[in-house]
Amino acid sequence: MTYRERLAAAVAARGNLCVGIDPMPSVLDAWGVAHDVRGLETVARGIVEELGEHAAAFKPQSAFFEPFGAAGIAVLERVLADIGQAGALSILDVKRGDIGSSMAGYAQAYLADDAPLASDAITVSPYLGVGSLLPAFELARATSRGIYVLARTSNPDGGHLQTATTPSGASVAQHVLDELTALNVEHDGLLGVVLGATHKDLGCDPSGFNGSILAPGVGAQGATIASLASVFQRALPLVLPTASRQIIGGGRQRLRARLQELLSG
């Protein structure tokens, strides 16, 4: 099955929510664990243990594992394995972006079948040009994995750059969308885009997009499940809303309750 087919099956079975695994210090505190590798593993794997059957996908943020060095990366490997065993998809949030052999190296790290950190999909940055990401696109197609390219992110700092006008008159975000739409024709729809759910005006039109839309910003950043329709309009069926702190920030015992509160809000 292609990534797009696996994602569609997961959404049909479990709904379209993606749970972010962001074991930041405040979350470790809420769970009552130490700021060490053991605490990291308790939180990260505990999220999947409790919610593994209740979400289509999980998005571990690599930045919270990397400070612990090799031991933290080993925890991340186990978390990715847990997600797969739970029958959900893993979207590893690494936001990599480079050119040539360097981008090919990043692709091998996350998209090769035998990679220790192999994930169903990853996030990448197009700042060096969408074309610079082709090594990742090609390997993802060969291994039936997915890619989510940043276009209009949920943080307010990105607006000046991402809504800036290109020589064609389109915004930078729209330019990224248009390039991905064209590439998706030959890449089996595996190329997705990151569009923040926090914006009243995206500064781009995703209605003609032919891939998945990863939509961070639901919950703690202010967006709600109910507000997605007004943000994405005709593209709503493509949206994979992502929430993290709103769900995981109350400790293990509150995980399922907070998940339901988010979905009903």
Model-based region annotation:
Residues 19, 58, 93, 122, ...:
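Conserved, mostly hydrophobic/aromatic
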